[in-house]
C-alpha cells in the first residue's frame, strides 16, 4: 500500500456528493482532507471525475457460465431450489467451467467500476472455494461472500460460516420453522464472535411466494421471519411487500436490497422503490449474472427512468447505502476518514459540459467511461 500520496482531480465529495476540485491528502490508504500546500511534482493528477467506490450489493456470479439460459421462463422454473433450470445446469458444470465463468464475471464488474460486491454463493463450501479461487486473479472487486448450506445440517452450516462472510438464503418458503430457527441459532453463535457476519435472505420477490407463505403459514415471508424472531441484516428484492411488511422492516431496522432490472427480467413486477426509499435504508444489486449484466451504472439509469428518484439518492444506494448494509467500514464516500477506494470516470462525453454532474453519472456513464485503476491494491 502507498503510505502517502496527493491526488489532484475533481471529486464528488461527502454525503451530498458536492463537486469539489482540489488535491486530496491520502495517508496509509485513508483520506485526510484537502491541501493547497504541495509540490506539483509530488501530485498524481487525474483529469476526469473521482466518485465513491461503486458497490453491487447482490449477485449470483456462478451463473455467469449459463448466461441467458432461461429466456421467457418463470422465476420458479429458473431458480427455485433444488430443481430450477439454473440449479440443474450448474450441477452439471465442471469446477473449471464455473471458476472461469466467475473470473470473467469479476473482470466485467471491474470494468464497470465496481469495487465491492456481495454474492449469494450457492453449493456450500465448494461454491465458496470456487469463488475464492477466481478472486485470486484480481485485487478488485472485493467480495462479501454469503454462503448457502447444501442441506440443513449443523456441521454443514458451521462449515459454510467458517469460510464465508455469512449466509445468503434463497427464501423462507424453502424451510420449515424448525429449520429456519436452527440455521439462525447457529448463525448467531458465529455473529457473537464476529459482528460483521451477515444473515440475508430473499423475501417477497414474487407474488406467488407471498401467497404461498400466506396459504401455508397464515403470514407473509417477512411476518413469518419476525414471528420466528429471525432478524436478517437485510432482505433482497421486497418486490411485493405488504404495508405490514414495510412497517415490520422499519420497526426492526432491516434494509432492503432492490434488484429492479432482475425483477423485470423475470417478469415478477416492480418494488415500490420510492416508498422504500422514504422509509428504509435501500441498497441496489443486479442479481443473477445469467439474466443481467452486473453493471451498477445500468441499474442506476434504469431506476431513474422508472421512478424518477433524485439522482443523488440513487447514487447513495450504489455507494454509501450499500456499504452500510454490507458493514463495509469507512467505504462508500469520498470524505475525510474514509478509505481511498474510488471509481475513476474518464473525461468523456458522458460528463463533459454537464449541468448536473450527479445526474450524468447516474444516467449516462457506462463501462467505457471507467478507468480500470485502484490506489489500494493491497487493502486489508
Curated annotation (Swiss-Prot):
InterPro entries: Amidohydro-rel, Metal-dep_hydrolase_composite, Metal_Hydrolase, MTA/SAH_deaminase. GO terms for molecular function: hydrolase activity, acting on carbon-nitrogen (but not peptide) bonds. Pfam families: Amidohydro_1. It comes from the Archaea. SUPFAM superfamilies: Metallo-dependent hydrolases (SSF51556). Belongs to the metallo-dependent hydrolases superfamily. This is Uncharacterized protein MJ0699.
Amino acid at each position: 500500500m502507498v503510505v502517502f500520496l496527493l491526488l489532484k482531480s475533481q471529486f464528488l465529495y461527502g454525503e451530498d456528493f458536492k463537486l469539489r476540485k482540489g488535491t486530496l491528502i491520502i495517508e496509509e490508504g485513508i483520506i485526510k482532507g484537502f491541501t493547497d500546500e504541495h509540490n506539483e511534482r509530488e501530485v498524481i493528477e487525474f483529469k476526469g471525475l473521482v466518485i465513491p467506490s461503486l458497490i453491487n450489493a447482490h449477485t449470483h456470479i456462478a451463473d455467469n457460465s449459463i448466461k441467458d439460459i432461461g429466456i421467457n421462463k418463470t422465476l420458479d422454473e429458473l431458480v427455485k431450489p433444488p430443481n430450477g433450470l439454473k440449479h440443474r445446469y450448474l450441477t452439471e458444470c465442471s469446477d473449471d467451467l464455473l471458476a472461469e465463468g466467475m473470473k470473467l464475471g469479476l473482470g466485467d464488474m471491474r470494468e464497470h467500476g465496481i469495487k465491492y460486491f456481495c454474492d449469494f454463493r450457492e453449493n456450500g463450501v465448494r461454491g465458496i472455494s470456487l469463488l475464492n479461487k477466481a478472486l485470486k486473479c484480481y485485487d478488485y472487486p472485493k467480495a462479501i461472500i454469503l454462503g448457502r448450506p447444501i442441506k440443513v445440517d449443523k456441521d454443514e452450516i458451521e462449515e459454510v460460516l467458517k469460510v464465508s462472510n455469512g449466509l445468503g438464503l434463497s427464501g423462507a418458503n424453502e424451510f420449515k420453522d424448525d429449520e429456519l430457527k436452527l440455521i439462525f441459532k447457529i448463525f448467531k453463535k458465529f455473529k457473537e464472535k464476529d459482528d460483521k457476519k451477515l444473515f440475508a435472505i430473499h423475501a417477497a420477490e414474487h407474488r406467488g411466494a407471498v401467497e404461498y407463505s400466506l396459504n401455508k403459514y397464515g403470514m407473509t415471508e417477512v411476518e413469518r421471519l419476525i414471528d420466528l424472531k429471525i432478524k436478517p441484516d437485510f432482505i433482497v428484492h421486497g418486490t411485493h411487500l405488504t404495508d405490514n411488511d414495510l412497517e415490520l422492516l422499519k420497526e426492526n431496522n432491516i434494509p432492503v436490497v432492490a434488484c429492479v432490472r432482475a425483477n423485470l427480467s423475470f417478469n415478477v413486477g416492480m418494488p415500490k422503490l420510492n416508498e422504500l426509499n422514504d422509509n428504509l435504508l435501500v441498497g441496489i444489486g443486479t442479481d443473477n449474472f445469467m439474466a443481467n449484466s452486473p453493471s451498477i451504472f445500468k441499474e442506476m439509469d434504469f431506476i431513474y427512468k422508472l421512478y424518477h428518484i433524485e439522482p443523488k439518492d440513487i447514487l447513495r444506494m450504489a455507494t454509501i447505502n450499500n456499504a452500510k448494509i454490507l458493514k463495509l467500514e469507512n467505504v462508500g464516500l469520498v470524505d475525510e476518514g474514509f478509505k481511498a477506494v474510488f471509481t475513476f470516470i474518464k473525461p468523456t462525453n458522458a460528463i463533459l459540459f454537464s449541468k448536473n454532474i450527479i445526474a450524468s453519472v447516474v444516467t449516462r456513464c457506462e463501462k467505457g467511461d471507467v478507468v480500470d485503476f485502484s490506489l489500494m491494491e493491497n487493502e486489508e
